[in-house]
């Protein structure tokens, strides 16, 4: 009986969530302009952790996310921007794509644009570049974990999605296409454009 209860509890824990869970720090109103201090702290720390994780992935040199490939491609093409600055510009551009689908940004959306790009801009130049494959794998693994932790923190704050997530969910709502197909279409398109511009993955 105890084993059965433990097994069911584990299964519930590992079951994919259909929506972002509500926790004690979640804002009851995603459009709030005056959220609780604890909510803001967790939001900001989460977005910093996300940016740090993305920075580790970039520094590891063993593979980037599609959006980072695009930012790197833009930075290499322009030759005047860092990846962090290009990430900021991409986020702003994606925000304009919210207009036709009538998405509304929250405080978390705006801070996402600023904090993640700033963290990448500051951290990538100071993180070690290594030719040791095992160290690179360790850095990449740590980066993936930090991105997951950071995402969980800022999404559960419920103060607005990041520009990319908001565009994805907005397109799904506007078109009725399953979210998985929307995500794959967006990320493959972004990846191809990034590669054409010279980004690496």
Explain the meaning of each model-derived region.
Residues 2-201:
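Core subunits and conserved enzymes of cellular information-processing
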